[in-house]
Curated annotation (Swiss-Prot):
Plays an important role in the regulation of embryonic development, cell proliferation and cell differentiation. Required for normal branching morphogenesis. Growth factor active on keratinocytes. Possible major paracrine effector of normal epithelial cell proliferation. SUPFAM superfamilies: Cytokine. The keyword Plastid does not apply. Glycans are attached at residue 45. GO terms for cellular component: extracellular region. Keywords: Glycoprotein, Growth factor, Heparin-binding, Mitogen, Secreted, Signal. One of its GO terms (biological process) is positive regulation of cell division. The keyword Repressor does not apply. It comes from Canis lupus familiaris (Dog). InterPro entries: Fibroblast_GF_fam (IPR002209), IL1/FGF (IPR008996). Belongs to the heparin-binding growth factors family. Residues 1-31 form the signal peptide. This is Fibroblast growth factor 7. One of its GO terms (molecular function) is growth factor activity.
Length: 194
């Protein structure tokens, strides 16, 4: 009689343990699939906070993207025919179409397609435009967790901190010395041209 009970209990225990293992594995895979890349990077034990931001292949050299840079302050970055850098709220303005060219890994040069001027920043953090591309025209492009991009001068810093391309609430460029990565004035969406 005991053998008969064991043969019925043993398969039940096996089925239950298999069921629990399947549920456990399913829960883990569902939890991993629901994670953002930043959360998964945290679980992999990345120590640097810079590693938690996304990176794309186009940042590795030679790529050219044509985009409108839309600031979180509701202005498009614009370089006009005289080389003046400012914001515009006109989406269809031809001077707000930018060519974002990868110079090195994570480093880009931004050029107005219509004006043919490059965006540049001097050591005081003032944004201006140049016909010829040089080190002042190189910016570190960083994609933030909120899906916005920041552009910090690759050459210049202020008191050890980065200086960012930024447009204030009136569309006027903010000096790099007064900017921080967290400020919405420095957050841009590279919008595809439609």
């Amino acid at each position: 009689m005991r053998k008969w009970i064991l043969t019925w209990i043993l398969p039940t225990l096996l089925y239950r343990s298999c069921f629990h293992i399947i549920c456990l594995v399913g829960t883990i895979s569902l939890a991993c699939n629901d994670m953002t890349p930043e959360q998964m990077a945290t679980n992999v034990n990345c120590s640097s906070p810079e590693r938690h931001t996304r990176s794309y292949d186009y940042m590795e050299g030679g790529d050219i993207r044509v985009r409108r840079l839309f600031c979180r302050t509701q202005w498009y970055l614009r370089i006009d025919k005289r080389g003046k850098v400012k914001g515009t709220q006109e989406m269809k303005n031809s001077y707000n179409i930018m060519e974002i060219r990868t110079v090195a890994v994570g480093i880009v040069a931004i050029k107005g397609v219509e004006s043919e001027y490059y965006l540049a920043m001097n050591k005081e953090g003032k944004l201006y435009a140049k016909k010829e591309c040089n080190e002042d025209c190189n910016f570190k492009e960083l994609i933030l967790e909120n899906h916005y991009n920041t552009y910090a001068s690759a050459k210049w810093t202020h008191s050890g901190g980065e200086m960012f391309v930024a447009l204030n609430q009136k569309g006027v460029p903010v000096r790099g010395k007064k900017t921080k990565k967290e400020q919405k004035t420095a957050h841009f969406l590279p919008m595809a041209i439609t």
